[in-house]
């Protein structure tokens, strides 16, 4: 254990292939970083879709928090960073309806062309400021609608991946603006969704 590891902040950094928990402490005027846990993040093909293994990732995050405590860190806060566009749907009782589907899933193939038969593409880009990519949340949701996915009827709330981890860690459901801006659902000027 280090001399002074009070006021430590943890970063939970989830990437497409791996994740890690990093402890950051200001010691004698210098920022000290230590990777306390590293883990793999693999997608799971089940039926016709590719899913993130959210329960396993959440367990790995909790393992990292426990390891930080065992190393003597006094954790003051945690930041959670993941990829954008993917999400989990929460029902009215606070339960996750399904493992989140991975942006690498083929369900959004061809969706931009279908959406832009309904929306004006240029006006949409002017409103959101987000590059059109088939993986974006807008097209994931439209695919679900086109396929009459019953989760859309049951869902009470959509949480983007970092907010989903935060929700299951704290019990507080929020969507942070920066990650929500990756969805192609937000009005960039009004900073909200219509």
Predicted regions and their residues:
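N-terminal glycine/serine-rich phosphate-binding loop of ATP-dependent small-molecule kinases
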Residues: 1-99, 110, 114, 126, ...
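Gly/Ser/Thr-rich active-site cleft segment
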Residues: 14-16, 124-194
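Carbohydrate-associated surface elements
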Residues: 105
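Gly/Ser-rich phosphate-binding catalytic loop and adjacent alpha/beta segment
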Residues: 108-111, 118, 132-134
């Amino acid at each position: 254990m280090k001399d002074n590891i009070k006021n430590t902040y943890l970063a939970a950094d989830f990437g497409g292939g791996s994740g890690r928990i990093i402890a950051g402490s200001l010691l004698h005027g210098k920022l000290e970083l230590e990777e306390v846990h590293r883990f793999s993040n693999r997608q799971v093909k089940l039926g016709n879709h590719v899913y993130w293994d959210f329960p396993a990732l959440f367990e790995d995050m909790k393992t990292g928090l426990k390891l930080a405590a065992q190393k003597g860190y006094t954790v003051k806060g945690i930041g959670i960073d993941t990829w954008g566009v993917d999400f989990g749907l929460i029902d009215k009782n606070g339960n996750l309806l399904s493992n989140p589907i991975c942006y690498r899933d083929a369900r959004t193939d061809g969706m931009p062309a279908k959406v832009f038969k309904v929306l004006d593409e240029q006006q949409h880009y002017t409103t959101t400021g987000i590059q059109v990519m088939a993986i974006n949340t807008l097209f994931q949701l439209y695919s679900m609608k086109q396929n009459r996915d019953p989760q859309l009827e049951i869902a009470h709330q959509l949480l983007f991946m970092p907010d989903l981890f935060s929700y299951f860690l704290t019990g507080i459901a929020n969507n942070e603006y920066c990650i929500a801006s990756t969805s192609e659902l937000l009005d960039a000027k009004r900073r909200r969704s219509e």
